[in-house]
Regions:
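Positively charged, small/polar-rich N-terminal and surface patches that mediate targeting and assembly
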Residues: 1-116
Length: 116
């Protein structure tokens, strides 16, 4: 079985939608880290202070096929009606893995069987 790490960097206000969507599609354990983004756009200022906005970094270890399915669903959440993106989502291959809950492995196996 091949695994991928899915990373979604989203505004805090979209964090729960991303988590709920991923869980609905079969994700188990999810790790969320706080962060702040420095993008290409001019920063907002308020009384002389620069506001950069808080970001959530959502991490998931997933079976490779499931990671693509979840990536596509999250991507749809991040694009608004004006076609503007409010985050980024990507995956990368995971070579070695230890400590994953065995019940999660059986969920991944079931997903593989269902997709065949």
């Amino acid at each position: 079985m091949k695994f991928s790490v899915l990373v979604a960097i989203v505004p805090e206000e979209l964090e729960q939608k991303v988590v709920d969507n991923a869980r609905d599609l079969g994700a188990g354990g999810i790790t969320i880290l706080g962060g702040r983004g420095i993008g290409n756009n001019t920063k907002k200022t308020f009384f002389g202070m620069t506001y950069e906005g808080s970001q959530s970094v959502v991490l998931m270890v997933l079976e490779k096929g499931l990671s693509l399915e979840i990536l596509k669903a999250i991507q749809e959440l991040l694009i608004d009606k004006d076609k503007k993106s409010h985050g980024v989502v990507f995956t990368f291959a995971l070579e070695h893995l230890g400590g994953i809950d065995l019940s999660q492995l059986s969920k991944f196996e079931n997903h593989l069987k269902d997709s065949i």
